[in-house]
Amino acid sequence: MCSIGAGRKGGVRAEGTRNIIAAMKAAGVSRLICQSTLGIGESWKNLNAFWKYLMFGLFIRPAYLDHVEQEKLVRESGLDWSIVRPAAFIDGELTGHYRHGFPATANDTKLEISRADVADFMLKNLVDNTYLHKTPGLSY
């Protein structure tokens, strides 16, 4: 599992993911669950104007571009990957009640999810191939 973060900074996610992929290949490990963010690729359509133009457009643009590069590395890795795209992290308890795999046309998500629920979903996907080579969004 890969859940690397660096706040607003760029470069950390892609570089860390590159190292994880290399280590997995060297060890013969094939299953990778990688946490990215809602808004990458086709999930851009799930975002509201605040996230599209203010947050990812201005304030955390380097982090956004880092996620784009990270996802490219995962897709090209040759591993059995799933890229999880959670909405904005919030503090909160594990609820086990969240939406996942919604289409890019869904515009009724809350655009937030607890870290505990993100971890729950990622752990479940280690043994579930429903989202193998897919990029499910994750939100309340």
Question: In which residue ranges do the predicted regions lie?
Answer:
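Glycine/proline-rich active-site loop of Rossmann-fold NAD(P)-dependent oxidoreductases
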Residues: 42-44, 77, 93-99, 125-134
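NAD(P)H-binding glycine-rich loop region in Rossmannoid oxidoreductase-like domains
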Residues: 1-19, 23-26, 130
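Mid/C-terminal beta-alpha module of Rossmann-like enzyme folds, strongest
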Residues: 27-32, 103-140
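SDR active-site strand-loop-helix element
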Residues: 1, 32-37, 84-86
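Conserved Rossmann-fold NAD(P)-dependent oxidoreductase catalytic core, especially the SDR/UDP-sugar
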Residues: 18-62, 70-71, 76
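Conserved beta-loop-beta element that borders a ligand/cofactor-binding pocket
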Residues: 71-92
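Short-chain dehydrogenase/reductase
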Residues: 10-14, 48-49, 59-69, 108-116
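NAD(P)-dependent short-chain dehydrogenase/reductase
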Residues: 88-106
